[in-house]
Amino acid sequence: MRMNEPVDAQPAPSFLPMSRRFRGYLPVVVDVETGGFDWNKHALLEIACVPIEMGADGRFFPGETASAHLVPAPGLEIDPKSLEITGIVLDHPFRFAKQEKEALDHVFAPVRAAVKKYGCQRAILVGHNAHFDLNFLNAAVARVGHKRNPFHPFSVFDTVTLAGVAYGQTVLARAAQAAGLDWNAADAHSAVYDTEQTARLFCKIANAWPGPV
């Protein structure tokens, strides 16, 4: 050992820190449940976010989930067929829905904290058909005039593409099963369940990919 070499010297990690892994962006998985397909006229009803964390070994894992049910914004429509698919009961006594501004504050706060924790510049939305989620999110942000949206306004990581490349599957349920993840069809179309499963899928694919060093 050389005279000036620290006794506890460790080899340099063979992976990039989160702040550099995705050009300064922190992946955050988002899923929304809505009153239809048109973000300009249909209501946002549920949202969930899961920041992606990085362990000491450089492997990714899902962080804590933040979620909210939303009161439909005034003037927006809800297609009854969408409620049949999601199973959302708008007047359920335990739905505890928040107004859009309050709901966005609730889910954005832990995202901003995770961005700061990893020294990233901002969050980048990860989703399955990600621009659907981003468009509804951006529409809600615009409606309430939210000034602290942590997400990139148009860039995304789409697990449809990632799963298509990795497993040859583009449907979330089939992609999750191809990745060796459990899938419960009864829980699907809940923003929390779909977000958490998408986060697991993203981590499975990202951890299998030899990232830049």
From Swiss-Prot:
Belongs to the RNase T family. Trims short 3' overhangs of a variety of RNA species, leaving a one or two nucleotide 3' overhang. Responsible for the end-turnover of tRNA: specifically removes the terminal AMP residue from uncharged tRNA (tRNA-C-C-A). Also appears to be involved in tRNA biosynthesis. The keyword Transmembrane helix does not apply. GO terms for molecular function: 3'-5' exonuclease activity; magnesium ion binding; nucleic acid binding; RNA exonuclease activity, producing 5'-phosphomonoesters. The record marks F37, F132, F154 as: Important for substrate binding and specificity. GO terms for cellular component: cytosol. Homodimer. HAMAP family: RNase_T. Binds two Mg(2+) per subunit. The active form of the enzyme binds two Mg(2+) ions in its active site. The first Mg(2+) forms only one salt bridge with the protein. Transmembrane segments: none annotated. InterPro entries: Exonuclease_RNaseT/DNA_pol3 (IPR013520), RNase_T (IPR005987), RNaseH-like_sf (IPR012337), RNaseH_sf (IPR036397). It comes from Xanthomonas axonopodis pv. citri (strain 306). It comes from the Bacteria. Its EC number is 3.1.13.-. This is Ribonuclease T. Mg(2+) 2 binds at D31, E33, H189, D194. Mg(2+) 1 binds at D31. Keywords: Exonuclease, Hydrolase, Magnesium, Metal-binding, Nuclease, tRNA processing. The active site is at H189. Its cofactor is Mg(2+). Residues 28-202 form the Exonuclease domain. One of its GO terms (biological process) is DNA replication proofreading.
